[in-house]
From Swiss-Prot:
InterPro entries in the cross-refs: Glyco_trans_19
Organism: Rickettsia prowazekii (strain Madrid E)
One CC-aspect GO term: membrane
UniProt-recorded name of the protein: Lipid-A-disaccharide synthase
Function summary: Condensation of UDP-2,3-diacylglucosamine and 2,3-diacylglucosamine-1-phosphate to form lipid A disaccharide, a precursor of lipid A, a phosphorylated glycolipid that anchors the lipopolysaccharide to the outer membrane of the cell.
UniProt catalytic activity: a lipid X + a UDP-2-N,3-O-bis[(3R)-3-hydroxyacyl]-alpha-D-glucosamine = a lipid A disaccharide + UDP + H(+)
Pathway participation: Bacterial outer membrane biogenesis; LPS lipid A biosynthesis
Amino acid sequence: MKKIYFIAGEMSGDFIGGHVIQNLKSNEGLEFTGIGGKYMEEAGNFKSLFTITAINLIGFIEIIPHLLKIKKLIDKTVEHIINSKADLLITIDSPGFTYRVAKRVRKLLPNLKMIHIVAPSVWAYKADRAVNYAKIYDCLFALLPFEPPYFTKVGLDCRYIGHPIMEQEFYRDKIALRKELKIDENERILCVTLGTRKGEILRHLPIFIDAIQEISKDYKNLTIIFPLAHPDHEAIIKPFLDNIQFNYLFLSNERLKAYAVSDLALAKSGTNTLEISASGTPMVVAYKVNIISFIIIMLLIKIKYVSLINIIAGSEIIPEFIQFNCKANLISNKLKELLSNSQKRYNQVVKSKKILQKLGFESNRSPSYIAAKIIKQEFL
């Protein structure tokens, strides 16, 4: 019986891990253990060592109060890996946690095979991470086609598998979705994404609500959809919706329906922006972090944009309002501009689709199948 130890530190990594496990399950004699979420637990006989929300943290300053707790979780994870006598360690994204675990494990178990899924964005900042990963991992699976050369040139075996959004089926029939969700055909629908972490939600919510309130003055037929990453998030958002002037509804675990049915989206920067683009919905992106974290990020990064669509295009296809520009009046003005101009909305969708095609979207590529095939043939 071969044992694979997985570590996923956030929902996007859990999604990838779940699909990889699903593709590995066809091989009898494999056992899965480690840290993950609902997708990994549903995919196989997998029970997480602890909930991934414990390590789902972001930012440089925001993470400081949790450092002692994270160190204890790293210690616990390393001990669990050693005791599990795993044949292969697979870490997924969440470099702040997974890299530290892998580095410790490499010293203690120098012969253990180790794979990391989701290449760190060395093309954006901290290029030296490529060398650091080469010292620890046996193989790296990249989601973007241009990433492997950054790592192979420093001696790390890096394979392009494709982006996990390719694993999903996106909704196309907006009329049918409106009927299913009982939304009148005359309503204008704005999808609002706030993030998967409580801190992100609380940071963006007041700004986003103020922006929506401003739009609702001009659009009386406005309905807001809040797709929830977790049902508990409704209780976080609800107190901010007292005395509001617009209609709203929550959709739990139905984010792709929320993206597809909407006329426009106001999105917190992240993987969700790719999913919204793949759903054929135009958007405005906004993002804000702690000011000290932002200063550190600005000193490190080499790119102008935060949305992957814009980064690859080298231009602002999707309007971005980051940090000091993440203001309700600026956001609402741009949303109004797009709501009132169908041609601008259409142009964004068309340009975004071309970028998605560069990423392999609509190519029938299955990243998890490719990853599982490499794992089975070369590492077990």
